[in-house]
Amino acid sequence: MSQEPSSSFSDGFMESDFSQGSFSASDDAELSIPSEFAESVDELSSSSDNGDQGQPLTEPNNIPIDEDTVYNIWGQVVGTRRKDIGPDGSSLDMFLERHKDTNEFFRTVYDPAKGYKRANLTPEEEEMIRNVMVSRPYNDAPGLSRMNIQSTLVNKNIMRTALTSDIVGPKEKYASKAIVRKIEKLREGIERGEIVYDPNRYKVDENRGLVVGNRDLWADVDETEDPSMRIPKGRGEMYMNPTKPKLPGHALSYNPPLEYLNIDGDGSQQKLQSLRQIKTYTNFVKDQFDRCVTLYLNPRQRLRKEEDMDSMLPTLPNRSLLTPYPTFCAMTIRTGTRRINGLTFSPKGMFFAVGGRDCILRVFETYSGRQVRAIPVLSTKKLEKKSINFLNLEINCCKWCPRTDVSIIAVCAGDELIFVDAGICESGNYNEVRERTRFLLNARPETTQPCPHMAWEMHAGVTSGGKSYASGFVTQVSSNAYNEGSEDDDAAESARFNEERHQRGHEGQIDADVYTVYTRLNQFVLLRIHHTHLVSFCNWHFQGDYIVTVCTDDKSRAKVTLHQLSKWHSLSPFNRLKSKIIGAHFRTKKSELIVVSERSSRIYNLLTGDKLSTLYPGVKQVTASGMGYGDNFITGSADSQCALFANAAGPEPTAKLCYHTSTIRNIDVHPCGGLVATCSDDGIVQISRIVDASLVKMHPGQFDEKLYNRMIPCVVLNRRRQAADGSVGISRVTWHPRQPWLLCSGTDGVLRLFK
């Protein structure tokens, strides 16, 4: 231990450390070594000295070195060179030796000491190999039993995978979840009394199959059985295995071997020259014929119920029974806009309104096609020359109020719900209808109750964020004049949404694409309800007091909103609607609301707010929905399927039709009858008829029972409107409220009225 420290070790300390007394030691002091390390120190010293007893560190130990073994610089074995094992005899000798004694052959190994020839293993070597295979110590293996690894493991890293096959897994101990659910249902049924145990139900008759009854194989078809079971009496009642005779042996042969001759000593067995010389040949033909008859009479396969494909299809009635429905185009109107997104008829059908991309609501007369009104509900002004990304504000939907005493059209344009006075009258005095309309929409700011994230803009002022600003110019019902003099004129003008600047920027930065949207109130536009996101759909209640709006944006805080005009109140009943909402419909006979999403439709009770049921159309994505004044609810999908829910009852549709080749864009149901119109991007309008109770009562005995609550296609309209590239499609369809007339609009801005 007198070696000097290496340079690398001594460089880490300074001479000042020793001089300052950090390591103080006297000359007489000795280094004390614990007793438990004394032996190891002696071994290290003996191995490190370069004397006669030890070996130098630079030389490897005296271990037997094989010429074919590869070592590293530390003397460790890292591999062996390829050895050419000599031939162990011919292949035939090898094969014979292997099959002579299989157990002894597989106990031999190649011994390198004997020139890589096969040598037998001793019992001790076999035991050693066997102990290594089962992970036992080979020195005292006979006295040890098989060790349990989990019992000897003392550290906290428990092995999750068992190394032995005697551990039973959890799946073999316990039953599956499906079996547990079935047993739980059976237990509940027994407790409720629905399942009654009958001990004789599954009792097997011991004599069953032993007694064969008489059957009439050649009888006619039983009249009491199902007509589709075209099986004679008794032919399909049971299955009989065909008779199989025993194969003849040597004793029955006409030319038996010699050892079978004269076995009994009576000379009955004899050797004949041909088969015809035996005694039983006289009945051979009869026996074969009887066997053929037996094989024919017994059924050769298990007969099944045969279904005729034509019998499964219902018999379609004559098209004359489905009338009336539109058959020809009576009028064509070119509006001048590119795309039309809103179509609606007045309550009596004398006028219809159209809205599209130009944000102008046009009102036409039904019988002449003359344009009566053109009301701009939204206008835009470009502030910059270059504009690429711009939010296209257009009319998404428009619905006419079903009340006949007022003239109101609800328009969804941008993020606003706009109430427009059409300025027409279908019955009664025009001035009275106009006064009622303005009185219904002339709300006061202090009495309105909008949602926290919405704002109501009226002629009397603005209500937004829980604050109301009154204006001095209030619309008078009698003289239609504006009186000024209110103190809140400036506050109302500052809060009024006359100018809204929509910027497509982030973090407050002004982008080059800037548009100014002008939304003003005039003699036709009486009320605006501002939402936070794009309003894509609206629908009236049949009484004309409630209206529901739908925002399809996923970031919208209120996807479905209810507005009541009589009380000037807004309500957002659903806070957690994760899926994308397509539309919403009121039920006519019940106070229920149907909310349509991409995958399903949910029915809610408006009085309690509870979810009553869920309708699953079974399609990938719902794109359109329709519901008339009845309870028949219809959905259309992106895969061109149309599903009917008769009376909106049951989670699954009662009927499905697939006559389109592209996505269905709109569906409308006639309010008076069961006519259904669907339009698609393929430029086709499909007219179908629902077989309901009224149609069956009108034509008794003409419709099959399988056709009840089904849709029957009547006619295909507007096939010529599809362009060569398929760019022209049908976007909207709507029915006349009192006549079987259909109005449809395309993506080219052309209206067609079918009668």
Curated annotation (Swiss-Prot):
Compartment list: Nucleus; Nucleus, Nucleolus; Nucleus membrane
Gene induction: Expression remains constant in trophozoites and in encysting cells.
One Pfam family cited in the UniProt record for this chain: WD40
UniProt-listed InterPro entries: BOP1/Erb1 (IPR028598), BOP1_N_dom (IPR012953), WD40/YVTN_repeat-like_dom_sf (IPR015943), WD40_repeat_dom_sf (IPR036322), WD40_rpt (IPR001680)
Stretches for region Disordered: 1-65, 482-505
Segments of this protein annotated with the region Interaction with EB1: 309-754
Secretion signal, residue range per the UniProt entry: none
Keywords from the named record: Membrane, Nucleus, Repeat, Ribosome biogenesis, rRNA processing, WD repeat
Molecular functions (GO terms): ribonucleoprotein complex binding
Entry GO terms, CC: nuclear membrane; nucleolus; nucleus; PeBoW complex; preribosome, large subunit precursor
Bias (Polar residues) ranges: 1-10, 43-61
A GO BP annotation: maturation of LSU-rRNA from tricistronic rRNA transcript (SSU-rRNA, 5.8S rRNA, LSU-rRNA)
Comp. bias regions, Basic and acidic residues: 496-505
Domain of life from the UniProt record: Eukaryota
Sequence ranges of the WD repeats: 335-374, 617-655, 659-698, 725-755
HAMAP family associated with the record: BOP1
Oligomer and partners: Interacts (via C-terminal WD repeats) with giardin subunit beta. Interacts (via C-terminal WD repeats) with EB1.
Family the entry assigns: Belongs to the WD repeat BOP1/ERB1 family.
Function comment: Required for maturation of ribosomal RNAs and formation of the large ribosomal subunit.
Entry protein name: Ribosome biogenesis protein BOP1
Species the sequence originates in: Giardia intestinalis
